Each structure stands twice: as C-alpha cells, then as structure tokens.
C-alpha cells in the first residue's frame, strides 16, 4: 500500500534568524528559545527526542528534559533500560527539540555522563509518590505478557512503601548530555531556512551559518 503525501506542504513564514540576534553562549540562546516556547504554549516544550546507539542498532524515543545549565541537559531514566544499556556501550547521543508551532527546532550532539546520586535523589524526591512507585514497579524495556502484571507490580510497591518516603532505586537516575554541537533552526520561506550551529572548540563556542 502506498500513501502519497507529496501534496502536504507548509510554508514557513513566522520569523527569521540573524547572526546578530544570537547570544554568544548557546545555553543562553537555548534558554531564550525555551522561554519563548513556553510563552507560546507549545505542548510539552521539554519533550525531546533522544537518539542512542550500540554496535548494531540505533534507537530513538522521546524523553523529558528536567533541567539544563552551562554543564548540559539532564534527563532521568531506568539504568536497566535499553537506552541505558546502549549508553554503556556508546555514550554519544543526539537530542532534538521539535517546536513546530514556532517553526523551530534545536538539535544537540554530545555525550552523556551519569549525574551524581545526590542529583538523582533530589529530583526523585520531588516526583509525585505514584511516579516514584512506578519507577520501582516497571522493569523498563523488559517483556510483559500483560498489562495486569505491571499493575500488580505497582500495587505491590504501594504496599511495600506504604509508610514513609519511597527510596531512590539503585537502578534509576539521571544522565547529563554534555554538548559539543548545538544547532538552532528557524523555518523560512521557499525552504531557505536559517540554520546556525555552535561548535565547541578548545573550550570556546564557534558560531557558523549552515546552508539549508
């Protein structure tokens, strides 16, 4: 079966991006665009596609950015998940923020390091208790014969941790994506898009315009 989508076309007309408008610091530029995405009520602006790979396979999924600073971009996950197993083999990753409502996207390339236990505990403690229990209940990426098994595991965790605080699982925590390249893309008319890439070289960020 073939479905022809060639007639689907959207002209990008919202705005442009000039070199003079860019911060010399890519994290400051990301902060500005992220704030603008929030102000524009972009759905889940913190949602980002995370691409990982091992020796034989490339995988991609959506995860949530939890915070960022000049050191990198942090997300949390199960350390026994498929993504984590791939990261043990190959720490190089790519992120993509597709803010289509603003005709923008941000692409980030770099590598990951695990955050320390204190950072993981601080974030885990801020989560709703049901989410904490879910982290304990789910053996992420393992096979499930039915949803009922997952729900039963969740109920078991509710009983197990019915009193007191839910502890941080030793198989759960954060990764920090430390970027070497950050690209800002703004859609333009006639597919002549504006693209600027920040590349880290000798501890300094170099900015270049890219052809669309």
From Swiss-Prot:
Catalytic reaction(s) noted: pyridoxamine 5'-phosphate + O2 + H2O = pyridoxal 5'-phosphate + H2O2 + NH4(+); pyridoxine 5'-phosphate + O2 = pyridoxal 5'-phosphate + H2O2
Keywords noted in UniProt: Flavoprotein, FMN, Oxidoreductase, Pyridoxine biosynthesis
InterPro entries cross-referenced by the UniProt entry: Pyridox_Oxase, Pyridox_Oxase_CS, Pyridox_Oxase_N, Pyridoxamine_oxidase_dimer_C, Split_barrel_FMN-bd
Cofactor binding, per record: Binds 1 FMN per subunit.
Required cofactor names: FMN
Pathway: Cofactor metabolism; pyridoxal 5'-phosphate salvage; pyridoxal 5'-phosphate from pyridoxamine 5'-phosphate: step 1/1; Cofactor metabolism; pyridoxal 5'-phosphate salvage; pyridoxal 5'-phosphate from pyridoxine 5'-phosphate: step 1/1
PROSITE patterns per record: PYRIDOX_OXIDASE (PS01064)
Pfam families from the UniProt entry: PNP_phzG_C, PNPOx_N
Any one GO biological process: pyridoxine biosynthetic process
Enzyme class per UniProt: oxidoreductase
Superkingdom: Bacteria
EC number in record: 1.4.3.5
Gene3D superfamilies in alphabetical order: Electron Transport, Fmn-binding Protein, Chain A
Residues binding FMN: 61-66, 76-77, 82-83, 105, 140-141, 185, 195
MF annotations from Gene Ontology: FMN binding; pyridoxamine phosphate oxidase activity
Binding, substrate: 66, 123, 127, 131, 191-193
Family: Belongs to the pyridoxamine 5'-phosphate oxidase family.
Function summary: Catalyzes the oxidation of either pyridoxine 5'-phosphate (PNP) or pyridoxamine 5'-phosphate (PMP) into pyridoxal 5'-phosphate (PLP).
Description of how the protein assembles with itself and partners: Homodimer.
The name this protein goes by in its record: Pyridoxine/pyridoxamine 5'-phosphate oxidase
Natural source organism: Ruthia magnifica subsp. Calyptogena magnifica
């Amino acid at each position: 079966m073939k479905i022809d989508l060639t007639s689907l076309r959207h002209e990008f007309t919202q705005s442009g991006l000039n070199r003079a408008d860019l911060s010399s610091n890519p994290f400051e530029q990301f902060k500005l665009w992220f704030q603008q995405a929030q102000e524009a009520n972009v759905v889940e602006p913190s949602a980002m596609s995370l691409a990982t790979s091992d020796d034989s396979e490339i995988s991609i999924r959506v995860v949530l950015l939890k915070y960022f600073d000049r050191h990198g971009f942090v997300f949390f996950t199960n350390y026994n998940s498929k993504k984590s197993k791939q990261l043990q083999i190959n720490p190089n990753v790519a992120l993509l923020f597709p803010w289509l409502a603003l005709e923008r996207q941000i692409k980030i390339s770099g590598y990951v390091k695990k955050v320390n236990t204190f950072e993981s505990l601080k974030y885990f403690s801020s989560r709703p208790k049901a989410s904490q229990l879910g982290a304990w209940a789910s053996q992420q990426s393992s096979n499930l014969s039915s949803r009922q098994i997952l729900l039963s595991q969740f109920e078991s965790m509710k009983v197990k941790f019915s009193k007191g605080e839910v502890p941080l699982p030793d198989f759960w925590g954060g990764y920090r994506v430390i970027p070497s390249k950050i690209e800002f893309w703004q859609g333009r008319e006639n597919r002549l898009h504006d693209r600027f890439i920040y590349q880290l070289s000798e501890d300094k960020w170099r900015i270049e315009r890219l052809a669309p």
